[in-house]
């Protein structure tokens, strides 16, 4: 972003306005992670001159068809994509699974390839892998400018276009992304900008991605999220209580460091800490998904914004993220966990959690109204959640 002008040896892209909005809306989150000024990023980007060899915008031509009982799930083996797969399987969408490989993610592909082999043996579904070589263009270390968050917030938009040929090969009507309810959470940064930690996964933006895939496929391929009505903790509960055969494959960690070289959970990051907390809150054995170390010890306080931790994902800085931790620690306490951070929670926050218990229960276990789910599948999906959330609150939530 230091260059005054960029010349592309291509036509002007059809989706230039989409990527422009996606990028602009992601800047505040990038700035927070990179510890730079949002205003500086916006100014440099807006002042950058972009030219194309040919200004004509070419429209796509597509003559394929799609089947209403076929889908492709963008599967990362995180809880969201695993639940998406399980729900699509239950409602008869015959899900195929695909994974976009980021070359700069050090150990992620190795672990997911191993999981995919086991997954295929158990469920008979092959994981289609696509290497996203252009992803190196946002790898700051590879480019020699240092680690940066810039560009990573375009992933969902990019992946939808990358996976279109996969959808075509299976005549899939639906391209399914694991964008749950809290993806719309946001906060105001220090400069007064609205900051979305995951704008490309928000429901409003998923509608725009859907418009892109519909345009590219002649209205044949829809981009949807079947878990949009659920908060994180509800996603975890439904996955591990209704679909334990699928849930045991969970890998939510990015394994970005040497700690994740030989195991699918690095056990030294805020994501591992959060998943461990949610699992304990729901009364599930962490060993079931390979979380072999207690992440609720005092030395892991830095991973929880509730205790003032700074080594956290930007989502944890939202009021929703803070309340999620409050409620999850409360449930872990009620489930009899006596870890150091649970004890600290009882001293500092137990009274607040008790006073807000009904509010928090409703917030995190209600079914939120979806806007990305087509009517023809919405009823079947919501009936599953009504049944399972009622059972969860009766049997698993103390």
Give the location of each predicted region.
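Low-complexity, highly charged intrinsically disordered N-terminal segments
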Residues: 1-60
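Nucleotide-activated chemistry modules centered on ATP-dependent adenylation/adenylyltransferase
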Residues: 38-71, 83-398
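Hydrophobic/small residue at the entry helix of a nucleotide-binding pocket
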Residues: 80
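Edge beta-strand plus adjacent loop/short-helix module at the start
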Residues: 74-75
């Amino acid at each position: 972003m230091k260059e005054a002008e960029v010349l592309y040896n291509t036509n002007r892209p059809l989706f230039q306005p989409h990527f422009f909005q996606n990028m602009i809306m992601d800047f505040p989150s990038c700035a927070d992670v990179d510890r730079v000024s949002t205003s500086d990023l916006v100014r440099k980007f807006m002042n950058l001159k972009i030219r194309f060899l040919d200004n004509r915008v070419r429209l796509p031509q597509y003559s394929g068809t799609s089947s209403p009982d076929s889908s492709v799930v963008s599967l990362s083996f995180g809880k969201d994509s695993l639940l998406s797969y399980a729900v699509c399987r239950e409602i008869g969408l015959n899900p195929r699974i695909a994974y976009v490989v980021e070359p700069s993610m050090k150990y992620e592909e190795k672990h997911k390839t191993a999981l995919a082999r086991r997954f295929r043996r158990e469920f008979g579904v092959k994981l289609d892998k696509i290497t996203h070589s252009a992803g190196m263009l946002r790898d700051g270390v590879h480019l020699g400018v240092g680690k940066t968050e810039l560009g990573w917030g375009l992933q969902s938009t990019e992946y939808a276009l990358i996976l279109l040929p996969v959808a075509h090969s299976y005549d899939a009507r639906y391209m399914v992304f694991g964008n749950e309810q809290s993806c719309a959470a946001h906060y105001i940064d220090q400069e007064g900008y609205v900051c979305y930690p995951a704008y490309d996964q928000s429901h409003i933006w998923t509608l725009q991605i859907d418009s892109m895939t519909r345009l590219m496929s002649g209205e044949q391929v829809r981009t949807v999220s079947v878990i949009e009505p659920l908060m994180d903790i509800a996603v975890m509960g439904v996955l591990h209580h209704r679909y334990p055969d699928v849930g045991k494959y969970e890998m939510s960690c990015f394994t970005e460091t040497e700690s994740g070289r030989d195991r699918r959970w690095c056990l030294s990051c805020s994501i591992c800490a959060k998943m461990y907390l949610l699992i304990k809150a729901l009364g599930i054995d962490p060993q079931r998904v390979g979380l072999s170390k207690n992440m609720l010890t005092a030395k892991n306080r830095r991973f929880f914004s509730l205790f003032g931790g700074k080594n956290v994902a930007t989502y944890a800085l939202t009021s929703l993220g803070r309340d999620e931790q409050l409620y999850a620690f409360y449930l872990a306490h009620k489930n009899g966990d006596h870890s150091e951070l649970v004890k600290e929670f009882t001293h500092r926050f137990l009274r607040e959690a008790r006073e807000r218990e009904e509010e928090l229960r409703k917030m995190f276990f209600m079914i939120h109204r979806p806007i990305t789910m087509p009517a023809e599948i919405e009823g079947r999906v919501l009936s599953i959640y009504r049944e399972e959330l009622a059972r969860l609150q009766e049997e698993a939530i103390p």
